[in-house]
């Protein structure tokens, strides 16, 4: 009887700690990559591999989330950062470049909107994807 109760409590604890509302978690070095049910695991793994190869995933703790906007069909790269980063034109420029790199390298040039988020993945600012004109390069 005690072992059944222990098993039930253990299962409850696992389910409770897994249900954070951020999605399923993958780990790449010290970067947490969450993905929602709107994308599949292979897409999230491809993103995680890119984050490692690009040097984004490193020894510093970071949290990102991958989702997809049901209305526009755009991918959403959601990153936990500061309110100051959301308001900085320098960071906005960097985030635009990074979303373009993710689009090109991970999602076959599909649009990727960058969401600057607080530590609960609440969006502070959306940086919409801007398609690059390849004929100008």
Where are these regions (language model features)?
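Post-signal peptide N-terminal segment of mature Sec-exported envelope proteins
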Residues: 28-46
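Short, non-transmembrane amphipathic alpha-helical segments
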Residues: 47-49, 56-58, 86-109
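Positively charged n-region of N-terminal signal peptides that target proteins for export
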Residues: 1-5, 10
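Solvent-exposed coil/turn segments that connect beta secondary-structure elements
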Residues: 80-84, 117-119
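A short amphipathic beta-strand at an alpha->beta junction
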Residues: 102-128
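C-terminal motif of bacterial Sec signal peptides marking the signal peptidase cleavage site
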Residues: 15-18
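Short edge beta-strands and adjacent turn/loop segments
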Residues: 25-27, 54-81
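Bacterial signal peptide processing site
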Residues: 20-22
């Amino acid at each position: 009887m005690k072992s059944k109760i222990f098993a039930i409590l253990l299962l409850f604890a696992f389910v409770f700690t897994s249900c954070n509302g951020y999605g399923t978690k993958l780990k790449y070095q010290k970067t947490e990559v969450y993905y929602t049910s709107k994308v599949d695991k292979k897409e999230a793994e491809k993103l995680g591999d890119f984050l490692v190869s690009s040097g984004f995933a490193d020894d510093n703790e970071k949290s990102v989330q991958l989702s997809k906007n049901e209305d526009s069909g755009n991918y959403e790269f959601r990153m936990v950062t500061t309110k100051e980063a959301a308001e900085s034109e320098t960071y906005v420029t960097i985030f635009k470049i990074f979303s373009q790199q993710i689009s090109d390298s991970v999602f076959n040039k599909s649009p990727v909107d960058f969401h600057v988020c607080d530590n609960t993945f609440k969006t502070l600012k959306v940086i919409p994807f801007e398609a690059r004109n390849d004929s100008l390069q």
